[in-house]
C-alpha cells in the first residue's frame, strides 16, 4: 500500500496564511509561509543586502518577533498558573494538603535524609500494624525522586530550602511545564496560535488546578506534564518516523510510569491509535518504526520500576498493546509479501495466514488466562467498564469519593465554557483529518467516557478539552480577524487565467485579450462587515474574560483549602480558623508513648503517621482489604465485641472524627455505612448492613434509629457527653448540626474505654483503651434465708420493720432464782 502523504487541506492552507496565525495564532513561521526566504521571482534575481546582525537584526525579522511574542505568552501563562495556585499558602501557610500527600511527603523526607538506596529498601513499621509495609516496592517513586533531586540541586548551590517547601511548591512549578508541553502538542496538531491558547487555558483551568495547587504533593501534579509530553513526542514520532523522537517518547513514558499509575492510559491509547490507522488504511513506515520502537523500548523501561515489575507482560491492562504490536508485524509482513507474490498467491496465503494467526492468538490468550499467567482486570480497572461492579463486590473502591460517577455540574464547574467549544474543535480536527488528528480524536472520545465514569479521571479529560477548545477559538479568530488582512495582502501571483498558465507559448497575444465580464458566481467572496466582526470578536473576548474570572473564583474558593485546616467566615467577613486536626495530632505526638498504636478509619492513616508519628493499623494504601474490614467490624460492633478485637490488635488509642458540633459533613458517622459494608464483605455472619437501618430503611441517629446503631462503638465514641451539650437556645441538648437531628442515645457510658482528648471544636476525639483488670469481679447470687425461700436478705441497717435471723442460733431459757425462805 502506498504511504499516504501528510494531508495538507485547503482549510489548513487558509489557516497558515491568516494574520491570526502570525500574531494571535502566531503559527506560520514554522511552515515557512511568511519567512524571510519567501521572495518573488523578480526580487530573487536582484541581490539584496543581508539583515543587520545582532539582536536588533533578529527582531527585525517577522519570525524573530513571533518567537519573542510566543516566549512572552508562554512565560506569562506559566506565571499566571503558578500564582493562581498560591491561595492556600497566602491564606494559611506552607503546609501539605489532603491525605495521600502526607505519605508522599514523609517518603520524600526519608529519601532526602537517608538516600535513594535506603528509600528503596525502607520497611515502614509505623503502617499496617502488625504487618508493616515495604515502601520501596509498593510506590511509584517518580514524585519523591523529582522532589528529592530538586532539593539536592538547590542545596548543592547553597540555596538552603527545607524539603517541605520543595514539596509544597512542586506542583505549581510543574503546571508551567504542563502548559509548555500542551503548547507543543497543540502546535503539532494544528498551529502555533492554537498552541498558545491551549497553554493559557490549561494554566488556569480548574480541572487541572484541583490536583496541582500549592501543598497538593500528589502524583498527578507531575504526571499530567509527563502525559502531555509523552503524547507530544509520540505525535512527533508518527509524523517524522524518526527513531530519535521515538526514543525520547520512550524516556518520557518511563518517567510517566515512575510517577503515576495512570500510565495505563498511555499504553492503551497509543496502540488504539495504531490500530485505527490500520483500519483507515493509513499504514506507513513511519507508523511501523514509531510503534515497534516504542513498544519494545517502553516495555523494557517500564519493567525497571519495582512496583510495576512484570505487569506489562502478565496483566490484562497491557495485553492490547501486545496484540497491536503482533498485528502490526503481521501487517508489515503481508505488505512485504504483496510486492513479491501474484494476486492469487497472495489471497490464498493471506486467508490461510489470518486464520492460523487468529486461532493461535485466541487459543494462547485462553490458555494463559486459564493457567493464571495473565492476571485478570483489577477491580479498579474493571469498575471503569462496569460502574456497579465495585459497589457490589469491592465496596472499599466505591467508598472513595474520587471513584464516584461524575455529575453534569462537575463538567461545567471544572471546565466552564470549554465544555461548549470543545466539540467544535473536535469537529475541525475530524473535518481535516490526518494521522496525528486521528490520535487527538481518539484521545478526546476515550477521555470523555472515562471522565464520565469516575470523577478522578476528569484530570485526564482537561488537557484534551483545552487543546480542542483552543483550536475552536483559534479558527474563530482567524476567520473574523484575518478577513481584512487577506484582502489587503492578496497572494502574489500572475493575473492571467488558467489557459495562459497551461499554454505559455501563446503569451504573445496576451495584451490583446478581451477580459470576460465577471458573473455573480465568479466574483470574489466579499469580506464580512465590520459590525459582524466586531460583535463576534467582542463576544469571544467576553467569554474568555468570564472563563478567567470563573477559574480564579473556583480556585480561590473550592480548591485552595487544605483539609487539615478548616476555616469559617462570620457575618462581618472575619475568618475563624479551625485547627482541630493538627491540635489532635500534636497531642498524640506529645502525650502518648512513641510506640503507641492508634486505630482509626483508613482515611486518616497517612496523616497520623505523618503529623503524629504514631503507628497505625490501616491507612490510605488500602492494600489489605481484610485488615480494613477488621477495623470496620470493631467500629460497627458493640463495646464488648469491639474490645476483644482491639485487644487482639494491641490497640492503645482510638481516634474518630465527629462533626456534629460545627456541622462538618465529612465525619465518621457519614462514612459509617461504608465501614459496615466493608466489614460485612469479610464477616457476613457478624455484621449485616440491614441491622443499622430502621424498619422503613432509614439511617437515623435519633430515637427512631436502629438499636444496633445506637449501641455500636462508633456511635458511642462520637456522641459521648454530647447529650449534655446545648449548642444554642433554639435546639435541645444533643442536637447534631450535621444530620439535623437530636441524638437518640444520650446516656452513654464506657466500660473498656475512657476519653483521652477532645479537640476545641469537638472535631477530633481520642479514646484510650483500658488494660484488662487483674481480677475480674464475679457476680454473686442474692442471699436467701430459711424463713422465706428465694427472698433477698434484708439487714437491720436497711429496714426497721423486718428483722434478720441467724442460722443455728442458741436458744436461752430464763431460769428461776431460788429464794432463801425455801432453803
Curated annotation (Swiss-Prot):
Subcellular location: Endoplasmic reticulum membrane
Binding, Mn(2+): 100, 218, 220
BP-aspect Gene Ontology terms: co-translational protein modification; ERAD pathway; glycoprotein catabolic process; post-translational protein modification; protein N-linked glycosylation; protein N-linked glycosylation via asparagine; response to unfolded protein
Residue positions where Phosphoserine is found in the record: 13, 18, 29, 495-496
Ranges that cross the membrane: 42-83, 171-189, 192-209, 221-240, 243-257, 263-279, 285-310, 319-338, 348-368, 408-430, 437-453, 458-479, 524-549
Motif (DXD motif 1): 98-100
Residues spanned by motif WWDYG motif: 601-605
S-S bonds: none
Cofactors named for this entry: Mg(2+); Mn(2+)
InterPro entries: Oligo_trans_STT3, STT3-PglB_core, STT3_N
Start-end of Basic and acidic residues biased regions: 517-526
Residues carrying N-acetylalanine: 2
Glycosylated residue positions: 613, 620, 624, 638
Cytoplasmic side, ranges: 2-41, 190-191, 241-242, 280-284, 339-347, 431-436, 480-523
Region: Interacts with target acceptor peptide in protein substrate, residue numbers: 601-603
Record-annotated site: Important for catalytic activity: 211
Name of the protein described by the UniProt record: Dolichyl-diphosphooligosaccharide--protein glycosyltransferase subunit STT3B
Gene (name only): Stt3b
Amino acid at each position: 500500500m502506498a504511504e499516504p502523504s501528510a494531508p495538507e487541506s485547503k482549510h489548513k492552507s487558509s489557516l497558515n496564511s491568516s494574520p491570526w496565525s502570525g500574531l494571535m495564532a502566531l503559527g506560520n513561521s514554522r511552515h515557512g509561509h511568511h519567512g524571510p526566504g519567501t521572495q518573488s521571482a523578480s526580487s530573487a534575481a536582484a541581490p539584496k543586502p543581508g539583515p543587520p546582525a545582532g539582536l536588533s537584526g533578529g527582531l527585525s525579522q517577522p519570525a524573530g518577533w513571533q518567537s519573542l511574542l510566543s516566549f512572552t505568552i508562554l512565560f506569562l501563562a506559566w506565571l499566571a498558573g503558578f500564582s493562581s495556585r498560591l491561595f492556600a499558602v497566602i491564606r494559611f501557610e506552607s503546609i501539605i494538603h489532603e491525605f495521600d500527600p502526607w505519605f508522599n511527603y514523609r517518603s520524600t523526607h526519608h529519601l532526602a535524609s537517608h538516600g535513594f538506596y535506603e528509600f528503596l529498601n525502607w520497611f515502614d513499621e509505623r503502617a499496617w500494624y502488625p504487618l508493616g509495609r515495604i515502601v520501596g516496592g509498593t510506590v511509584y517513586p517518580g514524585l519523591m525522586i523529582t522532589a528529592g533531586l530538586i532539593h539536592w540541586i538547590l542545596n548543592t548551590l547553597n540555596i538552603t530550602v527545607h524539603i517541605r517547601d520543595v514539596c509544597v511548591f512542586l506542583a505549581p512549578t510543574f503546571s508551567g511545564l504542563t502548559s509548555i508541553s500542551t503548547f507543543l502538542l497543540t502546535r503539532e496538531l494544528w498551529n502555533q496560535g492554537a498552541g498558545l491558547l491551549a497553554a493559557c487555558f490549561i494554566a488556569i483551568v480548574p480541572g487541572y488546578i484541583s490536583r496541582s495547587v500549592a501543598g497538593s504533593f500528589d502524583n498527578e501534579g507531575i504526571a499530567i506534564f509527563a502525559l502531555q509530553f509523552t503524547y507530544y513526542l509520540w505525535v512527533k514520532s508518527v509524523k517524522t518516523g524518526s527513531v530519535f523522537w521515538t526514543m525520547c517518547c520512550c524516556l518520557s513514558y518511563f518517567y510517566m510510569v515512575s510517577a503515576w499509575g495512570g500510565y495505563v492510559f498511555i499504553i492503551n491509547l497509543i496502540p488504539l491509535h495504531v490500530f485505527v490507522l490500520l483500519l483507515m488504511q493509513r499504514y506507513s513506515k513511519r507508523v511501523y518504526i514509531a510503534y515497534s520502537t516504542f513498544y519494545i523500548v517502553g516495555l523494557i523501561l517500564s519493567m525497571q520500576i519495582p512496583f510495576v515489575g512484570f505487569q506489562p507482560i502478565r496483566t490484562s491492562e497491557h495485553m492490547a498493546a501486545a496484540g497491536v504490536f503482533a498485528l502490526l508485524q503481521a501487517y508489515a509482513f503481508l505488505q512485504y509479501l504483496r510486492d513479491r507474490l501474484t494476486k492469487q498467491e497472495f489471497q490464498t496465503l493471506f486467508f490461510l495466514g489470518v486464520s492460523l494467526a487468529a486461532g493461535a492468538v485466541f487459543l494462547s490468550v485462553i490458555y494463559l488466562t486459564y493457567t493464571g499467567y495473565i492476571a485478570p482486570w483489577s477491580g479498579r480497572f474493571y469498575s471503569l467498564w462496569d460502574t456497579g461492579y465495585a459497589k457490589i463486590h469491592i465496596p472499599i473502591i466505591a467508598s472513595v469519593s474520587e471513584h464516584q460517577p461524575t455529575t453534569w455540574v462537575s463538567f461545567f464547574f471544572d471546565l466552564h465554557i470549554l465544555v461548549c467549544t470543545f466539540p467544535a474543535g473536535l469537529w475541525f480536527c475530524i473535518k481535516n483529518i490526518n494521522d496525528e488528528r486521528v490520535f487527538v480524536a481518539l484521545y478526546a472520545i476515550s477521555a470523555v467516557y472515562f471522565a464520565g465514569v469516575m470523577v478522578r479521571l476528569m484530570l485526564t479529560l482537561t488537557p484534551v478539552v483545552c487543546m480542542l477548545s483552543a483550536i475552536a477559538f483559534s479558527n474563530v479568530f482567524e476567520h473574523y480577524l484575518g478577513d481584512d488582512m487577506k484582502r489587503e495582502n492578496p497572494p502574489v501571483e500572475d493575473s492571467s487565467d488558467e489557459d495562459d498558465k497551461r499554454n505559455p507559448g501563446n503569451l504573445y497575444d496576451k495584451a490583446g485579450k478581451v477580459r470576460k465580464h465577471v458573473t455573480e458566481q465568479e466574483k470574489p467572496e466579499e469580506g464580512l462587515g465590520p459590525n459582524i466582526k466586531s460583535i463576534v470578536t467582542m463576544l469571544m473576548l467576553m467569554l474568555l474574560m468570564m472563563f478567567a474570572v470563573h477559574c480564579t473564583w473556583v480556585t480561590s474558593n473550592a480548591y485552595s483549602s487544605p483539609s487539615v485546616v478548616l476555616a469559617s467566615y462570620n457575618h462581618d467577613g472575619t475568618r475563624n480558623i479551625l485547627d482541630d486536626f493538627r491540635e489532635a495530632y500534636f497531642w498524640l505526638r506529645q502525650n502518648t508513648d512513641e510506640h503507641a498504636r492508634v486505630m482509626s478509619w483508613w482515611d486518616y492513616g497517612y496523616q497520623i503517621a505523618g503529623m503524629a508519628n504514631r503507628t497505625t493499623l490501616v491507612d490510605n494504601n488500602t492494600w489489605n482489604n481484610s485488615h480494613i474490614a477488621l477495623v470496620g467490624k470493631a467500629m460497627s460492633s458493640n463495646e464488648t465485641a469491639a474490645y476483644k478485637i482491639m485487644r487482639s490488635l494491641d490497640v492503645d488509642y482510638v481516634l474518630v472524627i465527629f462533626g456534629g458540633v460545627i456541622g462538618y459533613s465529612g465525619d465518621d458517622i457519614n462514612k459509617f455505612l461504608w465501614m459496615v459494608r466493608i466489614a460485612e464483605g469479610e464477616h457476613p455472619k457478624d455484621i449485616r448492613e440491614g441491622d443499622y437501618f430502621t424498619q422503613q430503611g432509614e439511617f437515623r441517629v435519633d430515637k427512631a434509629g436502629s438499636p444496633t446503631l445506637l449501641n455500636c462503638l462508633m456511635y458511642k465514641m462520637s456522641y459521648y457527653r454530647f447529650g449534655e451539650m446545648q449548642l444554642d437556645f433554639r435546639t435541645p441538648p444533643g442536637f447534631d448540626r450535621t444530620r439535623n437531628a437530636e441524638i437518640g442515645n444520650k446516656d452513654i457510658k464506657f466500660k473498656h474505654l475512657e476519653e483521652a482528648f477532645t479537640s476545641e471544636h469537638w472535631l477530633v476525639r481520642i479514646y484510650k483503651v483500658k488494660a484488662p483488670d487483674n481480677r475480674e469481679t464475679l457476680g454473686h447470687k442474692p442471699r436467701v434465708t430459711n424463713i422465706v425461700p428465694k427472698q433477698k436478705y434484708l439487714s437491720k441497717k436497711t429496714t426497721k420493720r423486718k428483722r434478720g435471723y441467724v442460722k443455728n442460733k442458741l436458744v436461752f431459757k430464763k431460769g428461776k432464782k431460788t429464794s432463801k425462805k425455801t432453803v
